[in-house]
């Protein structure tokens, strides 16, 4: 019976669906295990072979854990909101809901073909109202919460209001945008609008002025990762920095908990380090600088308080409010021109780019430690969102300050004994402090740091700042609050309306979900409002508690709804929780369900989400933990980043000025231009010439210079991309070789966490392996050849070696070496002509996570009437692995002369006798005396003769 993969795979797809093999329920009699893939954005292009890499890896592990007796939750869904669908809608007029639905259907079809063990009854789509109801619900809860630094958790905003009523801001230690001070009497005297404005300063979800990446052509704010080289990633439109009033989430309040939590989870060191750097904890001091000839002052934050005596200039971020306040009249034109230029650069570009730019403000600041007036400059290497948006520049001991000082000819004053700053700054934090104050200069303050180590000087300066009311000791974080609104259509609507004072009010939770309205255009309105401004019915009737026509707005009982929508990360920040209880219409997740599944045991996805989704999900989960909604503070116990499957591009070589193409090894004889060719018409680098001629009209009459009658293409490893014609559709592989071959081959390409090129040159070998496996069961006949005979020692050794190896490899995600071990074992069993049930049944159980279709078929051929998914993972027996004999190297005076096979359990004495009495030893001992024999058990017998 031949291995007919098409027939087998369809048969078992149908069976798994009909029997609901992968449907999972809470089962307190079994230990749980939750395996999750980062769910895909369903683009119109569908899946290419790079996408399933992580999905296959997680599927193998899910099946493995089920075979070990775990109750495994392994769901799949779609991150369905996003800019690409909206842009397509703008270009074609087709509603993004339709294109998204079609794309999801395509993805689902492709995923099902590969044979994943997803529980499709739990499928979620972030654009479904039943799903985004809970995104809106979480937002309302954040709006109605503040963060208490003392208790280190979110608390109801009503408690903060009560504190204001009782004692104002006295004694409060809470996360806020701006530190305010008022008494209870002052609070009570404020209007409702003033109170609401103040509360926005403390709410976890709030509206605030923030610097954003604004793309006028797209009519929306873009996240940093949506901007490349100053233009939008989507469409390549110009992007500028702009201050806008936006909805934000106070992620910064959770900065320390986000840091501390990294010590409790099993993530790679590199990923943890990325998050630590992104959160950016800095211990330092805030110091106030007065502006010369003015009553103004401003604050800087520094981690190097020891360098106060080396400040030779100050720098403001271009976005700082101080820029307008401190720019003098004669410098205004130059400053304004500079600000216009910097608007075109994102923060990421400013951080990465070392080009020095800046402009003098015309004002000076007084150094509180030296009394010197130092110039205040403006430069885009300072960011408004970190620290205070102003820095003190110490060019001798900071590389960016040094480059700036060199460029503009500013003083560089070294503060460490023996340091040379003639060519570069001295950034090391070790050494003895000098010039603090400088010799021969009348001290301005009574602090001297000279002779102290840098560490001692930092501590002394911090104490001086605190004792003399020059500022305060402070911990800063680089982590910013998340901008949470987008001027787009295709996203979650905010459950927000604006009252007569234009203050935001939340919809009642029982009125959720607030549905995304229909619009006739997906572009901003003529007056610049977001696309929801086109909606006819987009006002909130507070009496009837429903959406009504915009024309009815009276700002008494009917009010305008928010026109922005939520960003892409809104729907992906808690989706792992919804999978636990996807059909619950009363709660995000029921308490008993959450306490059973708890959190994700294994999460697999790409490293590109390190500073976006993975930060926001952790924040979101911690907030829900504070509210008592979830029982675990961290959402993802273990995280693995799969590598990327790169494209293997092929090239043909056109002789310049002709339509003639020359084969790879002959191209150096001509002047040629390499041209990308569709990899799907190339096999093992051999071009299908007829297919090439039919590929594009311009090649219909192409001519070829061949070698040995063949056209050999060139190749290169590049990003998999449609423009390079190197995208490989998994459907084609499944059709030609089967899903099991695709699954095995993707894992066989190399270590899971490394990037590797897609190369079909080895896929035939994997397919042959499955045929060889099939042959163990059927031989060359149409009937099953498996017997119940007792297995031999060699057969048992081969099997148990495999059990041990594959178990270890799966637990360590070393799938490529597992597949090598399978191939070795099947070769050994084929050589042994093994057809024993006691060997072959455990073999296919081991293979089931990797190649579930063929394993299921062979399992049923062996007479089982239940799915192999419910079999039990075999355990190896060390007794079968013990070697019966071992090869000794027999040496004379330290030189190996021959090998001798001896029993593995032989004693040292018997090994010595065997070596001395062996016929091969006679010639090396002839005429000599044996002086000593050294036996290293299991390895060497060394005979010393003389």
Curated annotation (Swiss-Prot):
UniProt keywords (A-Z) are: Aminoacyl-tRNA synthetase, ATP-binding, Cytoplasm, Ligase, Nucleotide-binding, Protein biosynthesis
Q: What is its EC number?
A: 6.1.1.4
Instruction: Name the reaction it catalyses.
Output: tRNA(Leu) + L-leucine + ATP = L-leucyl-tRNA(Leu) + AMP + diphosphate
Q: State which gene encodes it.
A: leuS
Q: Which GO terms describe its biological process?
A: leucyl-tRNA aminoacylation
Top enzyme class of this protein?
ligase
This one is known as Leucine--tRNA ligase
Q: What is the lineage of its organism?
A: Bacteria, Pseudomonadati, Bacteroidota, Bacteroidia, Bacteroidales
Residues crossing the lipid bilayer are none
Q: Where does ATP bind?
A: 722
Coiled coil keyword on record: no
Identify one Gene Ontology CC term for this UniProt entry: cytosol
Top-level taxon of origin: Bacteria
Q: Which family does it belong to?
A: Belongs to the class-I aminoacyl-tRNA synthetase family.
Q: Where is this motif: 'HIGH' region?
A: 40-51
* Residue span of motif 'KMSKS' region: 719-723
- Return the Pfam families for the record: Anticodon_1, tRNA-synt_1, tRNA-synt_1_2
Q: Which residues form the signal peptide?
A: none
Q: From the Swiss-Prot or TrEMBL record, what is one GO molecular function term?
A: leucine-tRNA ligase activity
Task: Write out the annotated subcellular location.
Answer: Cytoplasm
